[in-house]
Every structure is written in C-alpha cells, then in structure tokens.
C-alpha cells in the first residue's frame, strides 16, 4: 500500500511538472493597446543595470584605467574588434549599435540565471529573462534588419537593390527570401536557446537536489554568453555584407 501511495505521489509530481505552462503573460492595457508588461519590466531592469554600471565605472575616469573603467574599456575594445573584423574599415559608426546589442543580450541572458525573478509575483505568468520571450528576440532581429538595410542604402543608394539580381536575375526570389530568413534565424536561435536552458534548469531543480543542477546552470551561463556573441557577430556580418555587396 505504501509503495502504491509513493508511486501515485511520484506520478502526481511528474504530472505537476509537465503541467507547467509556457506562454502565460502579464499584460498592461494602455489606451487601446495591449502592452507586454513582464518583458518591459525585465528589460527596464537590464537597461538600469547597464546604465548604472557604466555610470559608476566612468564617473571618475583615470589616465591609467583601473577596476570598473579597465573592465569597460576591455569590453569596448572587444566589441571594436568584432565590428572591425565583420564590417571592415568603416566599422566606426556601427560600434555603438553592435555594442548595445551584445551587452543587452548578454546581460538579459545572464539575468535569467542570476536574478531571482521568481520571487516577484504577477497576476499572470512570471518574470524571466527578456530574451526568454519571442517578442524581444524578434524586435532585436528586426532592428538588425533595419540597420543593414540602412547601411546598404547609405553606402550605395538605390544601387543597393542591384544585389537581388546578382549573379543572375533567376536568383531574385531566393535573394529576397534571404532577407526574410535572416531576422527569423536570429530571433528563433536566441529565443530557443534561452528558453530551453531555463526549462532544463527548472525541471532539474524540481526533480533532483539543488546541488545537482549547478553544472547545468554554469553551462547555461557559458552558452548565454556565446549566444550574445553570435547574435552581435552575425549582426555585424550582415551590416558588412550590405555595405560591400553580394557574396
């Protein structure tokens, strides 16, 4: 009887875990618009962390940087290297855009693992990393699309659209389709990786003691950083491609 009761309780626990709903959201009604509240809240927190950290680090700049200033200068140099490698000698104006993308995604991804979002109760859904929501990743991908269209049109004018019939006009539909698949691949890659990582950690924490999921959480932090780098690198590569021509 005890064995049967234990089995029933175990199955009930597994059923409860399988019943975790994905896609429950908290909305704000502003006028006639429905605003995704939980994503805005977590995004504002991430932006506040970035602005606060940068302000503290550079509030008293030194000729020989130390501490936070040294760290931020290293990050800036890293972003410059990525931008220059992918875009070329005209990378300068695009460093702020690539840097903003990288830092926002990096801090957003890490916030999902390091910040205790779950302690804040919402009427519907729960707080999580901004990049855990498809709306955020699609918005970032669309911004990237606007950026590389702007870069190409600024550099080449209307001649930019000539790339769609190169090397042969037969490839026109494929070249047009490519511009739609770029933001799709960027958004779904980032969203899928971050969502999968958080779901795996939640399930492991529910099934096994706290210490066991720690290696998975550390791996998640590593892959979160890699995803931010991949997104920023691809964004820079698309901008560089639009400025140089069809490859």
UniProtKB/Swiss-Prot annotation:
It is found in: Plastid, Chloroplast thylakoid membrane. One of its GO terms (molecular function) is proton-transporting ATP synthase activity, rotational mechanism. The chain crosses the membrane at residues 38-58, 95-115, 134-154, 199-219, 220-240. Keywords: ATP synthesis, CF(0), Chloroplast, Hydrogen ion transport, Ion transport, Membrane, Plastid, Thylakoid, Transmembrane, Transmembrane helix, Transport. Pfam families: ATP-synt_A. Gene3D superfamilies: ATP synthase, F0 complex, subunit A. Signal peptide: none annotated. GO terms for cellular component: chloroplast thylakoid membrane; plasma membrane; proton-transporting ATP synthase complex. It comes from the Eukaryota. The keyword Thylakoid applies. Key component of the proton channel; it plays a direct role in the translocation of protons across the membrane. Belongs to the ATPase A chain family. PANTHER family: ATP SYNTHASE SUBUNIT A, CHLOROPLASTIC (PTHR42823:SF3). This is ATP synthase subunit a, chloroplastic. It comes from Nicotiana tabacum (Common tobacco).
């Amino acid at each position: 009887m005890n064995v049967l009761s234990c089995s029933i309780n175990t199955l009930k626990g597994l059923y409860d875990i399988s019943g975790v709903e994905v896609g429950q959201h908290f909305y704000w009604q502003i006028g006639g618009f429905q605003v995704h509240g939980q994503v805005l809240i977590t995004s504002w927190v991430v932006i506040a962390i970035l602005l606060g950290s940068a302000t503290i680090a550079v509030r008293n700049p030194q000729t020989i940087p130390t501490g936070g200033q040294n760290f931020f200068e290293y990050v800036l140099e890293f972003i410059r290297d990525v931008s220059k490698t992918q875009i070329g000698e005209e990378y300068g104006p695009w460093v702020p855009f690539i840097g903003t993308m990288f830092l926002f995604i990096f801090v957003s991804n890490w916030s999902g693992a390091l910040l205790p979002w779950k302690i804040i109760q919402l009427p519907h859904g729960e707080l999580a990393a901004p990049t855990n929501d498809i709306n955020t990743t699609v918005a970032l991908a669309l911004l990237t699309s606007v950026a590389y269209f702007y870069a190409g049109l600024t550099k080449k004018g209307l001649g930019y659209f000539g790339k769609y019939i190169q090397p042969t006009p037969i490839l026109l539909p494929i070249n047009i389709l490519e511009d739609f698949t770029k933001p799709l691949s960027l958004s779904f890659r980032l969203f899928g990786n971050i969502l999968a990582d958080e779901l795996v950690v939640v399930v492991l924490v529910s099934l096994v003691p706290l210490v066991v999921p720690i290696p998975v959480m550390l791996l998640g932090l590593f892959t979160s950083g890699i995803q931010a780098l991949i997104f920023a690198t691809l964004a820079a590569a698309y901008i560089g491609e639009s400025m140089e021509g069809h490859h």
